């Protein structure tokens, strides 16, 4: 457990952006396409005026959502508008709606699953690195790490390998900070 905490803290502290940001998280939904460009630009300007400096897209793919070219185009346009309003942009990568279910697998199956997640994250990072007019200021791994499911050494080892590989390989796509969130429910 100590090694796990050490790796998480190290990942946070090695980033030049490890100081607190005044960010807001956006969980893109298909229904967001109903918001007009003018409304979105106004919202981004208001966020900046209210002191926010960063927009974190929690994901740019969620299961089968945001896989179509027109859905990509909408997210690209929203991201560009945020940056035009003066916000930094942290781009969330792939989110698997079944992430928490897969944590219950055997170590070998878990390792295979985490490798598939990494491949999907890398695909998203490459896609977003090539978008004209959008320059991500960082990457967000959409998986959430809790203090219950990773307690055993058998579960923690694939997780630590995955986190180290994710940070290294995503940074190879674009040398920007890589973020991940964790939550604690008193299970330490």
Predicted regions located by residue number:
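Active-site groove signature of glycoside hydrolases
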Residues: 121-154
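Active-site beta-loop-alpha junctions enriched in small/polar residues
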Residues: 26-32, 60-62, 94-96, 142-146, ...
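Hydrophobic faces of well-ordered beta-strands that scaffold small-molecule active sites
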Residues: 22-26, 55-57, 89-93, 137, ...
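Active-site-adjacent "subsite" loops/lids of carbohydrate-active enzymes
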Residues: 90-127
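N-terminal signal peptide c-region/cleavage motif recognized by signal peptidases
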Residues: 13-15
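Short, acidic/polar
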Residues: 33-47, 119-127, 188
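Aromatic-lined substrate-binding rim segments of carbohydrate-active enzymes
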Residues: 40-49, 53-99, 155-175
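Active-site mouth loops of central-metabolism enzymes
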Residues: 25-39, 110-114
């Amino acid at each position: 457990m100590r090694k796990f905490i050490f790796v998480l803290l190290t990942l946070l502290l090695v980033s030049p952006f490890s100081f607190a940001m005044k960010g807001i998280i956006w969980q893109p939904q298909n229904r967001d396409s109903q918001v007009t460009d003018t409304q979105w630009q106004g919202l981004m300007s208001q966020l900046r005026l209210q002191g926010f400096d960063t927009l974190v897209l929690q994901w740019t793919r969620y299961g089968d959502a945001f896989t179509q070219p027109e859905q990509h185009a909408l997210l690209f346009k929203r991201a560009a508008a945020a940056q035009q309003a003066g916000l930094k942009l942290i781009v969330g990568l792939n989110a698997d709606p079944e992430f928490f279910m897969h944590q219950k697998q055997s170590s070998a199956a878990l390792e295979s699953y985490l490798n598939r997640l990494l491949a999907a994250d890398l695909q998203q990072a490459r896609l977003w690195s090539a978008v004209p007019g959008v320059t991500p200021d960082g990457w967000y791994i959409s998986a959430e790490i809790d203090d219950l499911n990773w307690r055993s050494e058998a579960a923690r080892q694939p997780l630590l390998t995955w986190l180290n590989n994710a940070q290294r390989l995503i940074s190879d796509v674009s040398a920007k900070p890589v973020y991940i969130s964790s939550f604690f429910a008193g299970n330490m």
